[in-house]
């Protein structure tokens, strides 16, 4: 009996080794005590079938000597459950969890890379809006320019500048308000007949330029070009416009009353020190609009050359500019505005065309400072008094009208005005006397 037990134990060991060799080592995992017992039972069943197969062989005398129906006892009777400590199980669980987390991270990275490559391969689509194709980008990585604080720095980075300029800031503000991207080429506008009732939208670059011209910070960005002769003449015409719309048709029945109301209105606005709005009123004739407030009228001869030099981008006024200023101030007239802007005075003593009341006010401003004017009420008689005063001045300075003859004997005796290097000659004196008698003007004043 002892020998039979020894033989059975030896066969059990051999069968266990053979069964272990047949199992796949990659699929065996010891997770709990139940799995261990399940593996032991499967080993027992395999061993039992192997023993029965060996007992059918005729050469096995040892097994045939005993009872053929006798089988070894169940291994659960002499095998005990393996006790695994909790620390070992916790360590195994941690190792398994870390491995799963690393695998998940790697899978997410691969998925993101695949998504980015797939977005880059997708071609941009186009939409038909009211018969026009409008390109739309499918790249979702590029977000809309809708943040005012970050967009200027992005634009500055693309232009390789250190700080954001005023144009970039205004472009960011326009993008935040309208919330749309730059339209592609050949489809930069959306017609007003679109189904979604969208108005015509210009590109952000054009809107930024328009905003920057109106609200620019650095005025040196917008430089004025050199002016031509026609532009200079137009500039004089702008300066020669009356300061206030005061053209009145004398044939109107209520012209005097309307004029007094206008003057009282101007006097009240002057006391309040407010800007007079350029609201034209139709009183028989069209009223010319006043010039812009930033363009001060050229009233002083010394200031005209410097104004022209600044407008023509010159450091100092030239001789032509000085002569033009001298010509304007000596003859005391301004460019006559075109159209029905003159008042024909139907008086028997004078047939001259009088200037506008605004030009008369400018003439007074040449002689008296605006702050020193008397603020008493301007009546109609005062207006006609100013007109008569201007008539007298116009008669003495009119070029196209012959003045009253004057005795030039003293001028003839003194002779013409000569330079220090010139010497008076008899012929020069004769020419001087002839000019005085013929043109009724001194020789040195003849144009």
Curated annotation (Swiss-Prot):
Family of the protein in this entry: Belongs to the RxLR effector family.
Extent of motif RxLR-dEER: 50-70
Lyase is among the record's keywords: no
Predominant localisation class: secreted
The protein's role, per its UniProt record: Secreted effector that dos not suppress the host cell death induced by cell death-inducing proteins.
Name of the protein in its database record: Secreted RxLR effector protein 115
Residue ranges of coiled coil: none
KW Glycoprotein (keyword) present: yes
Domain of life: Eukaryota
Signal sequence, start to end: 1-19
Species of the source: Plasmopara viticola
Gene Ontology cellular component annotations, sorted alphabetically: extracellular region; host cell cytoplasm; host cell nucleus
Keywords on record: Glycoprotein, Host cytoplasm, Host nucleus, Secreted, Signal, Virulence
Chain residue ranges for the region called Disordered: 57-78, 122-143, 171-198
Domain remark text: The RxLR-dEER motif acts to carry the protein into the host cell cytoplasm through binding to cell surface phosphatidylinositol-3-phosphate.
Subcellular location: Secreted; Host nucleus; Host cytoplasm
Residues carrying covalently attached carbohydrate according to the record: 41
């Amino acid at each position: 009996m002892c020998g039979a037990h020894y033989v059975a134990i030896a066969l059990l060991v051999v069968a266990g080794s053979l069964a272990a060799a047949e199992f796949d080592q990659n699929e065996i995992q010891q997770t709990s005590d139940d799995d261990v017992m399940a593996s032991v039972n499967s080993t027992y069943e395999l061993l039992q079938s192997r023993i029965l197969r060996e007992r059918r062989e005729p050469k096995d005398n040892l097994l045939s000597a005993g009872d053929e129906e006798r089988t070894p006892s169940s291994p659960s009777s002499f095998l005990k459950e393996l006790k695994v400590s909790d620390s070992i199980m916790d360590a195994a669980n941690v190792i398994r969890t870390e491995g799963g987390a690393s695998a998940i991270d790697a899978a997410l990275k691969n998925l993101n890379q695949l998504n980015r490559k797939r977005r880059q391969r997708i071609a941009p689509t186009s939409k038909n809006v009211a018969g026009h194709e409008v390109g739309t980008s499918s790249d979702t990585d590029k977000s809309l320019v809708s943040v005012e604080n970050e967009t200027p720095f992005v634009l500055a980075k693309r232009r390789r500048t250190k700080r954001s300029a005023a144009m970039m800031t205004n472009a960011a503000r326009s993008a935040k308000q309208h919330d749309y991207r730059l339209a592609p080429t050949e489809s930069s506008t959306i017609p007003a007949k679109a189904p979604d009732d969208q108005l015509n939208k210009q590109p952000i670059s054009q809107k930024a330029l328009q905003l920057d011209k109106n609200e620019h910070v650095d005025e040196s960005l917008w430089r004025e070009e050199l002016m031509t002769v026609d532009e200079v003449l137009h500039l004089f015409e702008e300066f020669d416009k009356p300061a206030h719309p005061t053209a009145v048709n004398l044939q109107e029945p209520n012209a005097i009353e309307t004029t007094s109301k206008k003057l009282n209105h101007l006097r009240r606005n002057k006391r309040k020190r407010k800007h007079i709005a350029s609201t034209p009123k139709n009183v028989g004739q069209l009223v010319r609009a006043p010039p812009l407030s930033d363009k001060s009228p050229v009233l002083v001869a010394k200031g005209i050359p410097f104004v022209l030099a600044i407008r023509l981008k010159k450091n100092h006024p030239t001789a032509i500019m000085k002569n033009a200023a001298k010509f304007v101030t000596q003859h005391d007239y301004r460019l006559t505005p075109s159209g029905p802007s003159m008042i024909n005075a139907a008086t028997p003593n004078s047939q001259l065309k009088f200037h506008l009341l605004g030009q008369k006010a400018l003439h007074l401003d040449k002689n008296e400072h605006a702050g020193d004017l008397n603020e008493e009420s301007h009546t109609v008689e005062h207006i006609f008094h100013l007109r008569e005063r201007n008539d007298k001045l116009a008669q003495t300075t009119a070029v196209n009208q012959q003045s009253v003859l004057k005795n030039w004997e003293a001028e003839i005796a003194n002779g013409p005005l000569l330079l220090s290097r010139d010497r008076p000659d008899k012929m020069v004196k004769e020419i001087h006397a002839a000019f005085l008698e013929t043109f009724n003007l001194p020789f040195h004043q003849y144009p």
